[in-house]
């Protein structure tokens, strides 16, 4: 594995001996075999270039994956190999793929090799430092041993599925339930309340979605606080496999050199596993369970172990997870779950009620929802809220049959409190202000716990359900109820 800085060896040239799709065999002089993970460069002549201004030559990067004997390496191409022929000259760069790091990455979109994709024609960008994407995780004695909660100011997350500083969070949800808005809001809050930056890795998803995300982030004003790296579904499997490492390397620089708290988004972590399976098959490895690569756990671990808190600052990761055929025992999601500290599940049913963020409070989990980490008051409040919501869920079938009036007084009270809790779990977002016209709100965790404890204790039993909708903390609730009373009096 490479360290922060890697000195390039004397360049050595080889020649292509075999081309099979994106797998390339290259022969080098004996004694000059490139190291595993070294980046090789080869130029393809584009014989089909007929339009004026169309590139006549294309340089592609190969990454060394295997040594075959004393003089041949097997590589994976990061770009299409159309036009590559046997005998083509290949140069060894002497170092792994290296990417720009530092402030130059903010507000820019990169490919896996660190090339800027959204550079303006008149823009001059100076890259002063590059880091290799293959790096060791922090040493054991550099890790932060204390488990801390990462306060987001979002009530439903802080109360029921608290995030771990330097932890890994799985984000589940279908199309249209608010994943993108939640991602944008987290980027905004990290910059605003934690003074940190965000890095986004788009792995194997639709190019249109990536383009929409960039446009929406620019509109929301969070693009300048974010570095984005994309390897979408039309890219080579080698590219999709390395994009998370490129993004993570940029995040590590912010953490280790600039001492910032970083939020790393990976969308979608399943596509990373899928790309690893494709590369493994191309390299001729024997498949393992359900056709996945035999080194699935090792590949996942090499990525996830680098996402952590050091004694300086942290990288907190939010990873969108696709579960194939909703089978949670599939090796890909099952391997990912072993690394997660919390799961946030977005529900279409909750979104259909107009409650955002549409986090399912009963399905979402966190390993630090424990008195040892969040305190007894937080733990007790979360359990009481979940118990009320669970009882309300059980009563829905009965209510559908006989109506709410036939319930016992205790169950009626539970249902009324549950409805208020559901509404109060919603919250206005800063990035949605221009669409909703309602200002965003940040609610400290202590205030969240106090507010929900009061609801569970029945302090607000006389306050109508409508007063709990679209507000932030206790002060907002009491102000809205006061205004409603004035309107009713008028």
UniProtKB/Swiss-Prot annotation:
The keyword Amino-acid biosynthesis does not apply. Its EC number is 7.1.2.2. InterPro entries: AAA+_ATPase, ATP-synt_VA_C, ATP_synth_F1_bsu, ATPase_alpha/beta_chains, ATPase_F1/V1/A1_a/bsu_N, ATPase_F1/V1/A1_a/bsu_N_sf, ATPase_F1/V1/A1_a/bsu_nucl-bd, ATPase_F1/V1_b/a_C. SMART domains: AAA. It is found in: Cell membrane. ATP binds at residues 173-180. The keyword Methyltransferase does not apply. It is an enzyme of class 7 (translocase). It is a peripheral membrane protein. GO terms for molecular function: ATP binding; ATP hydrolysis activity; proton-transporting ATP synthase activity, rotational mechanism. It catalyses: ATP + H2O + 4 H(+)(in) = ADP + phosphate + 5 H(+)(out). Keywords: ATP synthesis, ATP-binding, Cell membrane, CF(1), Hydrogen ion transport, Ion transport, Membrane, Nucleotide-binding, Translocase, Transport. CDD domains: ATP-synt_F1_beta_C, ATP-synt_F1_beta_N, F1-ATPase_beta_CD. Produces ATP from ADP in the presence of a proton gradient across the membrane. The catalytic sites are hosted primarily by the beta subunits. F-type ATPases have 2 components, CF(1) - the catalytic core - and CF(0) - the membrane proton channel. CF(1) has five subunits: alpha(3), beta(3), gamma(1), delta(1), epsilon(1). CF(0) has three main subunits: a(1), b(2) and c(9-12). The alpha and beta chains form an alternating ring which encloses part of the gamma chain. CF(1) is attached to CF(0) by a central stalk formed by the gamma and epsilon chains, while a peripheral stalk is formed by the delta and b chains. Belongs to the ATPase alpha/beta chains family. This is ATP synthase subunit beta. It comes from Bifidobacterium longum subsp. infantis (strain ATCC 15697 / DSM 20088 / JCM 1222 / NCTC 11817 / S12). The lineage of its organism: Bacteria, Bacillati, Actinomycetota, Actinomycetes, Bifidobacteriales. The gene is atpD.
């Amino acid at each position: 594995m490479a360290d922060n800085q890697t000195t390039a060896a004397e360049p050595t040239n080889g020649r292509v001996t075999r081309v099979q799709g994106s797998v390339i065999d290259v022969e080098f002089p004996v004694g000059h075999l490139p190291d595993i993970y070294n980046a090789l460069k080869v130029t393809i002549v584009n014989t089909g270039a007929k339009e004026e201004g169309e590139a006549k030559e294309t340089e592609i990067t190969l990454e060394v994956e295997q040594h075959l004997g004393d003089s041949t390496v097997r590589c994976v191409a990061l770009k299409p190999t159309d036009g590559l022929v046997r005998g083509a000259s290949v140069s060894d760069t002497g170092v792994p793929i290296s990417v720009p790091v530092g402030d130059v990455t903010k507000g820019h979109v990169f490919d896996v090799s660190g090339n800027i994709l959204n550079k303006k024609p008149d823009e001059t960008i100076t890259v002063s430092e590059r880091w290799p994407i293959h790096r060791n995780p922090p040493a054991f004695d550099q890790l932060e041993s204390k488990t801390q909660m990462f306060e987001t100011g979002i009530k439903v997350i802080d109360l029921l599925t608290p995030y771990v500083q330097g932890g890994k969070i799985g984000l589940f949800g279908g199309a249209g339930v608010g994943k993108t808005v939640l991602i944008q809001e987290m980027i905004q809050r990290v910059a605003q309340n934690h003074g940190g930056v965000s890095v986004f890795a788009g792995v194997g998803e639709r190019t249109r979605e990536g383009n929409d995300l960039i446009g929406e982030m620019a509109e929301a004003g969070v693009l300048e606080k974010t570095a984005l790296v994309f390897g979408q579904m039309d890219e080579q499997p080698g590219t999709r496999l390395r994009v998370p490492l490129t993004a993570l390397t940029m995040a590590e620089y912010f953490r280790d050199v600039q001492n910032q708290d970083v939020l790393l988004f990976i969308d979608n972590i399943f596509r990373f596993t899928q790309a690893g399976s494709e590369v493994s098959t191309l390299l001729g490895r024997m498949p393992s369970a359900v056709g996945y690569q035999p080194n699935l756990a090792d590949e996942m671990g090499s990525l996830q172990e680098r996402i952590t808190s050091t004694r300086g600052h942290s990288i907190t990761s939010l990873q969108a997870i696709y579960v194939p055929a909703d089978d949670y025992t599939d090796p890909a999601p099952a391997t990912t779950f072993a690394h997660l500290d919390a799961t946030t599940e977005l529900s279409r049913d909750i979104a259909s009620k107009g409650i955002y963020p549409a986090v399912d409070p009963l399905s979402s989990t966190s390993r630090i929802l424990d008195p040892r980490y969040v305190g007894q008051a937080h733990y007790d409040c979360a359990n009481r809220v979940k118990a009320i919501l669970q009882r309300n869920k059980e009563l829905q079938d009965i209510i559908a049959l006989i109506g709410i009036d036939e319930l016992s007084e205790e169950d009626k009270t539970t249902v009324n409190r549950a409805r208020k809790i559901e509404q109060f779990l919603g919250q206005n977002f800063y990035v949605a202000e221009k669409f909703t016209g309602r200002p965003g709100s940040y609610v400290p965790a202590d205030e969240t716990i106090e507010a929900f404890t009061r609801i569970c204790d029945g302090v607000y039993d006389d306050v109508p359900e409508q007063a709990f909708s679209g507000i932030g903390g206790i002060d907002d609730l009491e102000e809205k109820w006061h205004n409603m009373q004035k309107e009713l009096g008028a």
